[in-house]
Amino acid sequence: LELSEPTLDDTMPDTERLELAAQAAFDGCTEVKLTYHTVKKLAKTLREANFKVQIAGTLDMGVLTVMDVTGKLDAPMIGCAIDIGTTTVTGVLLNLETGELVAKASSGNGQIRYGADVINRIIEQSKPGGVKRLQDAILKETLVPLTAVMCKSAGITADRIFRASVASNTTMNHLLLGVDANPVRMEPYIPTFFQWRGMTAKDLGFPANPDAEILLAPNIGSYVGGDI
């Protein structure tokens, strides 16, 4: 986007200036929303880039949500896909504009020390502090370093990841989100959720743009996950 620069005669705020430029640039865009992360960096970014910037975000039902603004006009927009298995975790990074695979990596699941199968891990997370321990094992000890490896390989920073998709079994989904999975192993075997929408990287502590949506592949049973 190339924005008009403010003058003494044109004192429109930066946010409104960007919103008007974005509405003019995208067909079907009827409303523009800027995330807090974007607004915080907007003034400095616009002036350092002489008001010529690249934006990243989502356009849904006419509403453009701007998740980032940068003066680097060739900055890539990246998506991340992760398969969480009980033993192995695999991830890929994709260029969201071209579909190109830009990085791939695998690692062991950090939860393995708490049990080789989901039942033993549910038992472990049922102990005091267990939910947090199991979540940290998959998130902080596995996904964070795995994503760092992929970002280094792709030559990007994690804040260029604007969407992440995760597939795993029902128990792994609960443990990743820090949700008690004990009801899954107790008759009548009812999980807290099969699918969860609206979660961001900031909510979860996932290494990405803070407003990147984390998409969970929906599960279809207590022991049948979205990774089948």
Which residues fall in each region the model found?
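Nucleotide/phosphate-binding catalytic cleft detector across ATP-hydrolyzing
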Residues: L1-A81, T86, T98, Q135-D136, ...
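Active-site-proximal loop/short-helix segments
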Residues: N109, N169-M172
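Short glycine-rich, Thr/Ser-proximal phosphate-binding strand/loop in the N-terminal lobe
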Residues: N95-R133
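Extended, hydrophobic alpha-helical segments in both membrane/secreted and soluble proteins
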Residues: T87-G91, L101, L143
